[in-house]
């Protein structure tokens, strides 16, 4: 028996010829939705023109390929025929890959935070045909949850407001757009005068503030969800090494007769505090479930404050920054609580993971689907790096979060034998019920391993790694993002130098060369442009984004492949001194319907316009937390 047509269920038929238009898109995230019954369109003028011609609002859905909750909402709602038919009848639906269009993501994240008080992915935004937002949220479940309406309830309320209270909807969209525009700074940030030393008191104050926010019990800062604070750790390590080059010499020699490097007691105190905070966080993360103890690499964040339940996607930008932080800790010399040798092992394993799991060889494209299982060592032929590994693994046709990484006590005993299996389960905090799900727990010691524990782990680790390679693997998003790749180039170059591994420097050089050959667009009559993404060796989309332009040349210069400004190409030059000062957050040629994200207007206005249009309140969630 055929499924009834939309008109049979009281929906108007969508316009003739309307269909899902994502199959030919290069973005892996967009192609994940190409089989949905929703008539998705890529972001662009044509989709907005279609909404204007039909006199319907736009449903804008923004996410990324590795996002677990994006997969959940896709399965629950976008694969559902009833939900799709309602969307097709009453909206023009647009899909955006936030990693390809961070400018679009930033505009509508500002609106989403203003309206709902939360942000995350999947992002669900309702727009006028001219692109102005009037309602927004993140994940919507198929059935109502406490404090959160169902997706169908939201669609029906938006459609009812559009048809019955159009004037209020348009007025509120205008209020939001003007509020966001008014919250923007009058001009781009510009620092007057030449760069100089930072004020020592300001740096010491920052260390003190971080000390007040530190989670001393578990390492890191703040509570759950907890993200690895790479930039904060970089600052703390640098401050521990040299608190400030503007700090005045001590008035008198140190009473203990030690060489203080010209620092006074306050400088020494904050330097010590910075070192201790960084060491506690680095140790906690590397011994936790956030870090893949078998293959290396860090998950994007932990759902819990103690780092024990990771959100399993692995992002290039996170791992590039964390690799460099661990390398810099090694260079600093470590502490007795977190020795440099232990950090060097984490750094080496992470560098190997970057090349083995995210590495892309020249002129090849693996078959669509999961990434190849990790090899025993890095691929020395890597010329570029993929952007991420998925949080989910598809097992028997079903998305299961973290399934590749989970173990049970019984599974360990079957693989290693009763004695070793039980010992590893105890050492690595594997129990039933699992810490993540009924499927088990990720391996993590939670403390420094030494003596017999370290010997046991070194003995069984190859066997465990081999067994895991034979499991289904998470998918890989193979687009190359220039800015993230630049971060990885810098990290690999530093790792190669500090860890005495020249093959990592060689890999950094090859990847830097790829960025120059594929992503850089020189211009004879002015500054060139760095294209943000490439697929299969072809750069596409937009260029000139602030998140891309500083990172890639910095990484290439660090790799020693392109020191400073190379003669003849001028490749990094436009990024160091923007004309008229400052930097732009979006591409000059980007077609945006809104303002770049800076800050959000007060939520009171959002509450008022939700009331005036009788839309469901977009309350902050209790669970789940969007990606």
Per-region residue spans from a language model:
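Helix-capping and short linker residues that terminate individual alpha-solenoid repeat units
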Residues: 215, 287-291, 334, 359, ...
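Active-site-proximal alpha-helical segments within enzyme catalytic domains
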Residues: 322-325, 491, 552-555, 623-626
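Primarily a tetratricopeptide repeat
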Residues: 276, 280, 345, 349, ...
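Long, polar/charge-rich, low-hydrophobicity segments
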Residues: 359, 524-528, 532, 540-549, ...
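Long, K/E/R/D-enriched contiguous segments that form extended
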Residues: 483-486, 491-568
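Short linear capping/connector segments at secondary-structure termini
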Residues: 300-306, 388-394, 529-539, 592-598
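Replace the tail clause
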Residues: 1-491, 495-498
């Amino acid at each position: 028996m055929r499924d009834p047509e939309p008109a049979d269920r009281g929906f108007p038929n969508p316009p003739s010829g309307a269909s899902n238009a994502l199959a030919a898109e290069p973005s892996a995230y967009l192609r994940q939705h190409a089989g949905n019954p929703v008539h998705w369109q890529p972001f662009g003028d044509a989709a907005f023109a279609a909404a204007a011609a039909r006199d319907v609002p736009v449903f804008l859905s923004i996410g990324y390929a590795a996002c677990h909750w994006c997969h959940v909402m896709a399965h629950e709602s976008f694969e559902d025929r009833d939900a799709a038919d309602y969307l097709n009848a009453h909206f023009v639906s647009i899909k955006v890959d936030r990693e390809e269009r961070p400018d679009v993501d930033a505009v509508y994240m500002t609106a989403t935070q203003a309206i709902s008080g939360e942000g995350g992915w999947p992002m669900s935004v309702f727009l006028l045909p001219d692109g102005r937002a009037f309602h927004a949220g993140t994940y919507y479940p198929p059935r109502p949850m406490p404090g959160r309406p169902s997706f169908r309830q939201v669609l029906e309320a938006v459609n009812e407001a559009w048809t019955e209270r159009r004037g209020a909807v348009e007025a509120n969209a205008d209020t939001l757009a003007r509020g966001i525009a008014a919250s923007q700074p009058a001009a781009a940030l510009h620092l007057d005068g030449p760069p100089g030393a930072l004020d020592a008191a300001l740096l010491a104050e920052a260390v003190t503030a971080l000390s007040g926010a530190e989670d001393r019990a578990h390492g890191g800062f703040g509570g759950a969800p907890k993200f690895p604070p790479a930039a904060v750790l970089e600052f703390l390590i640098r401050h521990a090494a040299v608190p400030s080059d503007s700090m005045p010499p001590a008035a008198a020699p140190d009473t203990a007769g030690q060489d203080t490097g010209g620092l006074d007691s306050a400088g020494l105190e904050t330097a010590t505090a910075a070192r201790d905070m960084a060491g506690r966080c680095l140790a906690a993360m590397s011994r936790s479930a956030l870090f893949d103890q078998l293959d290396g690499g860090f998950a994007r964040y932990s759902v819990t404050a103690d780092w024990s339940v990771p959100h399993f996607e692995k992002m290039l930008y996170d791992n590039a920054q964390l690799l460099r932080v661990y390398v810099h800790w090694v260079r600093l010399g470590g502490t007795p609580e977190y020795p440099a040798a232990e950090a060097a092992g984490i750094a080496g394993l992470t560098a190997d993971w970057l090349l083995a799991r995210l590495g892309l060889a020249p002129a090849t494209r693996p078959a669509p689907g999961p990434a190849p299982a990790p090899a025993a060592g890095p691929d020395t032929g890597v010329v570029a790096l993929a952007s991420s590994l998925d949080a989910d693994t598809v097992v028997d046709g079903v998305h299961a979060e973290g399934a590749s990484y989970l173990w049970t006590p019984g599974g360990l005993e079957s693989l290693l034998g009763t004695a070793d299996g039980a010992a590893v389960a105890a050492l690595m905090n594997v129990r039933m019920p699992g810490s993540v799900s009924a499927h088990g727990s990720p391996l993590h010691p939670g403390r420094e391993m030494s003596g017999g524990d370290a010997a046991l782990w070194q003995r069984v680790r190859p066997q465990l790694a081999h067994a895991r390679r034979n499991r289904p693997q998470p998918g890989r998003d193979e687009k190359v993002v220039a800015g993230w790749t630049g971060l990885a180039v810098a990290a690999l170059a530093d790792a190669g130098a500090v860890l005495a591994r020249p093959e990592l420097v060689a890999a950094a050089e090859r990847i830097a060369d790829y960025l120059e050959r594929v992503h850089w667009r020189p211009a004879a009559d002015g500054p060139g442009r760095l294209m943000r993404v490439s697929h299969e060796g072809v750069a596409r989309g937009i260029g000139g984004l602030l998140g891309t332009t500083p990172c890639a040349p910095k990484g290439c210069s660090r790799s020693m492949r392109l020191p400073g400004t190379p003669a003849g190409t001028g490749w990094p030059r436009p990024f160091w001194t923007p004309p008229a000062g400052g930097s732009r957050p979006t591409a000059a040629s980007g077609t945006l319907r809104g303002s770049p994200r800076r800050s959000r207007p007060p939520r009171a206005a959002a509450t008022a316009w939700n009331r005036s249009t009788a839309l469901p309140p977009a309350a902050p969630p209790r669970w789940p937390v969007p990606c």
